[in-house]
Amino acid sequence: MPVVKGGVWTNIEDEILKASVSKYGLNQWARVSSLLARKTPKQCKARWNEWLDPSIRKIEWSKDEDEKLLHLAKLMPTQWRTIAPIVGRTANQCLERYQKLLDEAEQKEAAAALGLTGTGEASAPTADSVRRLRPGEIDPDPETKPAKADTVDLDEDEKEMLSEARARLANTQGKKAKRKARERQQEESRRLAALQKRRELKTAGINVKVTTRKPGQMDYNADIPFEQKPAPGFYDTSEELARNERERAAFDPKKVQLATKRKGDQDEDADRKRRKNDKEGSQSASLQEALKAGRMQKMREAEQSSKRRALVLPEPQVGEGELEDIVKMGMIGERAGQMARESENDATRGLVGSYSSLNTGAPIRTPRAPEQEDHIANEIRNIRALQETQSSLLGGENTPLHEGVASTGFDGVAPRKQVMSTPNPLATPMRSGANGMGMTPGGPGATPRAPGQTPLRTPRDGFSLNSVGDEVASRQQLLKGLAALPKPKETEWDLELPEDQMEVDAAEALEEDASERDRREREIREAQEALERRRRTQVMQRDLPRPAVVDIDLFLKHADSIPDPSQSMVAREAAMLMANDAIKFPAAGVKPARSSKVQVEQVDDAALAEARLQVLVEAGSAPKPEDVQKAWDREKSNSLLLGLACYDDDEEEEQVAIMRAALEEVQQSIVSSAEKGNKLEKKLNLHHGGYKQRAEMLRKKIGEASEALSKANDALSAFKTLAVSEEITITRRLEALREEVAYVSRREREAQELYRRIREESDHMPVVTNGYH
């Protein structure tokens, strides 16, 4: 028969769920539910999230929470999962509280109308009694209800569940028993498989050596740990035999049996005591954990219950310093009034009034704060009105709702708050007469009407010396006087100013910004540079190769020799342009030349553009590419370089003269360079002669030091060799001397022994006297 899981939660199931959650966490609900035979993973998760979670608040609902709940229910209807984390309760708690508020409001309205007002059974049912389960009904949400108390006698299923949970939850270290058994079975199967394989190979004549030892470790199955092999050869065992005989004689079987029994009893007592201590320790530990958890829960509940609304108090109307100033001013006024009353002048006594009759004779009480609107009741009325309204398809007027200040509003997630403040008794219309409707009393001691005046500091006197209406009266009198002035004559005057002068003045008054001026100057400079680049020759614009040195005289002479005037002018202008480019834009590494003959006329830009246009038009009638190729081949086959055709017609004498002049110029440059070199050499000798001598002296010293160092190294190596040989010789000499000393000592001992023996023999011999013994 299948078991239907669910139902009311018991205290045992709650405790098992807490322990399993502490071990498995909040994500392994299948494992958690495996410890509870009557609950599913979904029910376990719901029980934890709805009741057992320590973060769940189970205290009474406050007014702020009710307002927030109704406000969020108005913004997000039926979205209890979204509302719950904002309110700080669970979704089920929010839903139950919402329904309870609606039921209570409905009961109040029913009781106010025709409800039951009796006592006991005659009274109307409460909201809790309406939702209470009747006999035979099943709770649809048992996870949100308190646990049922445990019975005295548990069922067999409960006992089995409790024992299994205790056994599984107690194993907090190591692997599980099933996993260990499975690993042992796998290891045994591997061992048997390897054994069967070795047997089959051995039957086939193949011996396989079993090597289970890892590198650097010992195989305790094959080797003997801490083995000490006896020394090879024969040795005497009489001592061991004697020791064995003594131990055999001293051995008493009864004593050994008694000692073994005592040792076993001691071990059993120790094991019994250890098990008892472990049991007591586990019980005490579990008890301590339970007590600690209870204390923590009480502390959390106390913290939650202690979170009350902040006490809102108004700011003080008068500070300590102002009170002291008021007291001092009152004392000064009393002294002045007393002096005036004691004066003999009647006018003085009449002018000084009495300021003691202030409206502060009665004790000031803090008035009661005005009654606030009940937001909860208004929101419940709105919700019930919306629920009871008819469909919008039927038409009609909208349902009247309590909006504005009387509701929580739609401003945000948090409901609208009504700021509570204590009324100011000094700013309230009181008994004394006031000039205006709803104004502050104008008698002494009242708050003044004009802004900037301090209450209780400048009270009004009885003679209207400081009347507030004086300023208003003077202003009205001034306006009347201005209105009485005669009207000006109707004369029209037309004034015209020159527009140019106004524009110039405006331009002068307006100062140009520095950045705008720099930008304008930069644009003008860039435009001038671009125009200057366009005025250059095509060779400079296209950066074409050009001669480094230009002989202007030779080019001008060649241009003058051309018979055609137009061609001569073109050649002359080309020569002038080449020379001008060489002077203004010299090639890299070439010193710019200076010539007074080069004077290029500045051509207008319009004329230059017209000339370029004519060149382009004439270039359209250029020769064919075949003719150009033929001319190029002819010039290429000529041995004379391009550009030197002008020198082909010169006479031989002129060429010789030119070459001689070039040779003389080269010789002069060589001579001048040699003279400059000699001068520089003398100057360097003069400046660096001392350094050269110093360097030569240092070079000699370095050579001498190097030679001395090499000699010292040779001497050092020789002495090292001598030291080594001396050490060897000293050792040999010491050995020889020791041998000689040993030989002398041995000979001396032998002589002493001989002397002693002879002396003893002489002492034992009879004394001979005159030849008789």
UniProtKB/Swiss-Prot annotation:
Gene Ontology process terms (BP): mRNA cis splicing, via spliceosome
Highest taxon of source: Eukaryota
UniProt region (Disordered), positions on chain: 114-191, 219-321, 338-372
Any one of the GO CC terms: Prp19 complex
SUPFAM superfamilies recorded: Homeodomain-like
Subcellular location as annotated: Cytoplasm; Nucleus
Signal peptide span: none
Summary of the function given for this chain in its UniProt record: Involved in pre-mRNA splicing and cell cycle control.
Subunit structure of this chain's protein: Associated with the spliceosome.
Protein name: Pre-mRNA-splicing factor CEF1
Name of the gene encoding the protein in the UniProt record: CEF1
